[in-house]
């Protein structure tokens, strides 16, 4: 599946409250995650997805997010070609933050930010 043809949803269509059966998968790198992420997100860096497929839910909605939407589109294409039903989040965490949706940081005392 081509990353340009993956199913997508905008941040405004998805947030601020995810559906009850939904998982928001953040595929950014560890430093990006630590600086700021959606509070309900699950973190698996893009480079680790193929080795961690067992960590992903087998049912429910899977929404994939990165910084701007490029990596998550590639991850969505990969997941869909391997049996999941994943949806890319257009605009990524940049759009999430710009819309004023909640962010948390893993760094003690640091204000959350998208890097």
Regions found by a protein language model. Give the residues of each.
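Rhodanese-like catalytic fold shared by cysteine-dependent sulfurtransferases
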Residues: 1-23, 29-61, 70-115
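Short, surface-exposed ligand- or partner-binding patches at beta-edge/loop junctions that are enriched
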Residues: 65
């Amino acid at each position: 599946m081509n990353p340009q043809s993956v199913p997508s949803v905008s941040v405004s269509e998805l947030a601020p409250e995810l559906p009850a059966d939904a998982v928001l998968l953040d595929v950014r790198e560890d430093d990006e995650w630590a600086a700021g992420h959606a509070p309900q997100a699950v973190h698996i860096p893009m480079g680790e997805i193929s080795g961690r497929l067992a960590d992903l839910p087998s049912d429910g909605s899977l929404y994939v997010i990165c910084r701007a939407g490029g990596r998550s589109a590639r991850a969505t294409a990969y997941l869909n070609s391997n049996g999941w039903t994943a949806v890319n989040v257009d605009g990524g965490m940049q759009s999430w933050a710009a819309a004023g949706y909640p962010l948390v940081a893993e760094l003690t005392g640091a204000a959350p930010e998208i890097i």
